[in-house]
Amino acid sequence: MTDAAGRVEPSGVWATAVGVARVRAMETAREQPLFRDPLALAFATAGGRGPGTLSPPRADEAARRRWLEVALSIVIRTKFLDDLLNRAVASGVRQVVLLGAGMDSRAFRMDWPTGTRLFEVDTAEPLGFKASVLRQERAVARCERITVPVDLREDWPGALAAAGHDPAQPTVWIAEGLLIYLPADAVQSLLERVGALSAAGSRMGLTLGTRGVVERFRGDAAAGSAASMWVSEMPEDPVGWLDGLGWQAETFTLRDRAAAYGRPLLTPSQQDEGTGALVSAVRTAH
C-alpha cells in the first residue's frame, strides 16, 4: 500500500524503523537530549507515528513499562554507537557501513571528516520511503552518502563492492537493532561476511538481545510488534565468539551505559541481563 504522498507504507520488520524514529524524535524534543536527530520526526510522521503519538502508549502498566524500557534502550544504543563512530573516524577510518540502515540519519546529523563515505545497506522499500522524506525535508548529507538497496539474505557484499566500498581500507560497521531479528545461523553468516571485507583497524558496533530480554518481551508481545519478531539471542560468551571471528571486542550492558549517560534504568536489575547488549569491536585479523 502507498500513502497520500505515494510512499510505500511501512510493514514487517522495516516498519520497526519508524518506531525507532519516533523514539529518537521524543529524545530530540527533550531539554537535554543525548543526541539530536532533526529528521526523526519527519520519518515518524510519514510513517504514521507523528506528533499525536509522541508519548508512551496508554495500556496496562506492565505494557507501558516495557515500552518505556525499550524506548530507553533505543536512546542508549544510539548514543553508544554515535560515540563509537566518532572514535572510529578520529582514528582515521573513512568508510562507514550501516547494515539494515532503516531510518538512520547519521549521514545528516553527525559531523564527518572530509573524505568520509557512508554506505546505507537495506532493502529497496525502506530506502525508497526514506528518500521521499529526505526530498520533502530538503535534507543535505554531511558526507558522501551511498545507498545500497539489497536484501542481507542475498549477495550484499557484491552490491556493496559495486557501490564503491574498498575492503582494503578500514571500515566501521554498524548493525543497530538488526541482529535480534535474524536466526543464529544468519547472524554468524553475516558477521563472517563482514570480517571478509574488513581490513586491519576496522571497527564494529553491534546491539545484541540477551536471552532473558528476548524471552521476557516476546512472550506476551502483540502480533506484528517489534518484540514479536525477535528471534536471536546473544551468545553466552560474545567476546570469545567475536574473537573467533577475528575481532577484539568489549561488551557493555544497557544498564551500565544508561547510568554513565545520566539516564539510569529504573527497573530492577534482572539476573538474565547477561554480560552486555552493546558491543564495540576492533579488527585483529583478516
Swiss-Prot record:
The keyword rRNA-binding does not apply. GO terms for biological process: methylation. Exhibits S-adenosyl-L-methionine-dependent methyltransferase activity. Belongs to the UPF0677 family. Transmembrane segments: none annotated. It comes from Frankia alni (strain DSM 45986 / CECT 9034 / ACN14a). Keywords: Methyltransferase, S-adenosyl-L-methionine, Transferase. PANTHER family: S-ADENOSYL-L-METHIONINE-DEPENDENT METHYLTRANSFERASE YKTD-RELATED, S-ADENOSYL-L-METHIONINE-DEPENDENT METHYLTRANSFERASES SUPERFAMILY PROTEIN. This is Putative S-adenosyl-L-methionine-dependent methyltransferase FRAAL3718. InterPro entries: Ppm1/Ppm2/Tcmp, SAM-dependent_MTases_sf, SAM_mthyl_Trfase_ML2640-like. S-adenosyl-L-methionine binds at D122, D151, L152. Its EC number is 2.1.1.-.
